[in-house]
Amino acid sequence: MKLCIFGGNGFVGSAIARKAVARGWSVVSVSRSGRPFATPAGHSPAWVSEVEWRKGSPFDLSTYDALLPSCDALVTTLGTLLETPYKEQGVARPLSVLKALAENATGSRGNPLAKDGRERSYERLNRDSALQLFEAFHSSRSSTAATSPSPFVFISAEDIFRPFVPARYIQTKRDAETQIWQRAAADAPAPTVRPVFVRPSLMYHPHLNPPSTLPATLLEATSNLHALIPRALHLFPSPPPSTIPNAAVPPAAASLAALFAIPPIHVDAVGEAVCASIADEQTQGVVDVARMREMLGFDALGWGLAPGRGRKAGVV
């Protein structure tokens, strides 16, 4: 298995790369800088030397077109939670996030028509980059000898951040899912690409992103309490689970309710779930937190695994 990861040196992408290397897969990372992953302290883990690090952009086909025919699967982790800068070394920092949220709330984001504003827009980073990569990967399948549909994994998100984050964030994610699904379905009855939409909730890691642990612990507690409430008493019942994406976005109140109902997830668990989805030819469509926990063997009722406790399904 040869896996291409766009954004493999970021918070999520590095977790996927590490899990893929552990499986013995060949991994190539394509990112804007082309730099290998490094911890916040500047350390380079041993697995980093097993990955090929390349510089490229989803909007510049010449930077990766020759690579795709040799890849069995592609994962894109590209996207942005906010249209103003909020990451340091690829990891969201609390103060930077709060500053960006304030700028979004007050509308002081600068000129949206400026070059940097256009390049950081939700439409470009969350939707168009994924569509561009899907089309390129789909076109490359004619040059392969694959006997089954090749996995294309889009790292999407659970709808848990509204009204704190603009609705366009999740809308562009859902638009990308829907358009990719429809494009892949158009190849029936002989599809060449198997789309998978992984939807993590709040992702945390005690060491790579220590500030994420406190909110994760709190949300773990609220999700456990929510699980004890009879479904009939939920103010905003969760929609029936479906693997087919839907571009419709529910009211913001439903998103806020989901924030307290859906447990956070360790970024390494997301990495493992992505690799499991690639390896399982039956997995396609939406893979939400509940489905990830199911495939990784987490307990279904209490959601289990509070941040920083225990090791399960390769989570450390």
Listing of model-derived features with the role each one plays in the protein:
Residues G8-F11, A15-I16, A146, S150, ...:
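Oxidoreductase cofactor-interface core, primarily capturing Rossmann-like NAD(P)-dependent enzymes
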Residues A136-P149:
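A short helix-coil junction within the Rossmann-fold of NAD(P)-dependent oxidoreductases
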Residues K2, D72-A73, P151:
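Structural motif
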Residues M1, P40-A46, G90-K115, S143-A145, ...:
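Eukaryotic N-terminal low-complexity, Ser/Thr- and Lys/Arg-rich leader segments
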Residues P36-Q132, A136:
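NAD(P)H-binding glycine-rich loop region in Rossmannoid oxidoreductase-like domains
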Residues M1-W25:
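N-terminal Rossmann NAD(P)H-binding glycine-rich loop of SDR-like oxidoreductase domains
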Residues C4, V28, V196:
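Conserved beta-strand positions in the Rossmann-like core of class I SAM-dependent methyltransferases
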Residues W25-R32, P36:
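Conserved glycine-rich Rossmann-like NAD(P)H-binding loop of the short-chain dehydrogenase/reductase
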